[in-house]
């Protein structure tokens, strides 16, 4: 089968705009996510909070689990491959996954190369902490971006940092002349054509979601107000006291992110949020956001 063009894959990712994508580890959780209004689910064996707690090498999930989740829902199913592990990505494409997340939540397989995403029919989503990482991933064929945040912490501070970094750098680009854009492209190691396009249009050529540490409806609305196109929620739903109610609330807050009254209403009586971790208490070698380059 012919490989999809990058433009087609970007169009597929655009269809998720304004929505919430939820991490699920069972078909039952996937059904809960779909009923709550998720636009897609991320099929995993372990949510990031468990990967963080249990340590060891985190790899692609068992294809059998991913297929069981695919059969349980009608919405798109995403799955994660390790950074640089193009064979895991080939397997995920072969079993019919709708989107592949080349994810720093899993243990990187290659410390020098990300996957060449142009070789795949399936759209890829990748994490980024700044505009340089964003444009390098797009150059490799990513059809969708997300903040890296710090997954599995229930702490939104890194996602906020990464979103603000990308958008402030885009605003900076818009004030640069052509010579400055050439220099800037070299500094951030990104193709000049992409840098020029972003400077001209004032936005990324792909959708950019927030991910990492989003635990409450207010967290989701905060990132949406900062300018992201949608929300990934990992451990924040099924590690909380009332997953069904919290899932619905986060979807509502993402849709009505500019309406504090609705956010206040859906935030009532959600039960315990997931237990959070302060970023400065995490040893440097355990920080997931630093994986990838």
Curated annotation (Swiss-Prot):
Keyword field contains Lyase: yes
Molecular function via GO: pyridoxal 5'-phosphate synthase (glutamine hydrolysing) activity
Binding, D-glyceraldehyde 3-phosphate: 164
Catalysis performed (reactions): aldehydo-D-ribose 5-phosphate + D-glyceraldehyde 3-phosphate + L-glutamine = pyridoxal 5'-phosphate + L-glutamate + phosphate + 3 H2O + H(+)
Matches recorded under PROSITE patterns: PDXS_SNZ_1, PDXS_SNZ_2
Enzyme active site: 80
Keyword vocabulary terms for this entry: Lyase, Pyridoxal phosphate, Schiff base
Enzyme class: lyase
Listed InterPro entries: Aldolase_TIM, PdxS/SNZ, PdxS/SNZ_N, RibuloseP-bd_barrel
Any one Gene Ontology BP term: amino acid metabolic process
EC number(s) from the headed UniProt entry: 4.3.3.6
Alphabetical list of SUPFAM superfamilies matching this protein: Ribulose-phoshate binding barrel
Pathway connected to this protein: Cofactor biosynthesis; pyridoxal 5'-phosphate biosynthesis
Residues annotated to bind D-ribose 5-phosphate: 23, 152, 213, 234-235
Binding partners and assembly: In the presence of PdxT, forms a dodecamer of heterodimers.
Function (record text): Catalyzes the formation of pyridoxal 5'-phosphate from ribose 5-phosphate (RBP), glyceraldehyde 3-phosphate (G3P) and ammonia. The ammonia is provided by the PdxT subunit. Can also use ribulose 5-phosphate and dihydroxyacetone phosphate as substrates, resulting from enzyme-catalyzed isomerization of RBP and G3P, respectively.
Family: Belongs to the PdxS/SNZ family.
Name the UniProt record assigns to this protein: Pyridoxal 5'-phosphate synthase subunit PdxS
Provenance organism: Chloroflexus aggregans (strain MD-66 / DSM 9485)
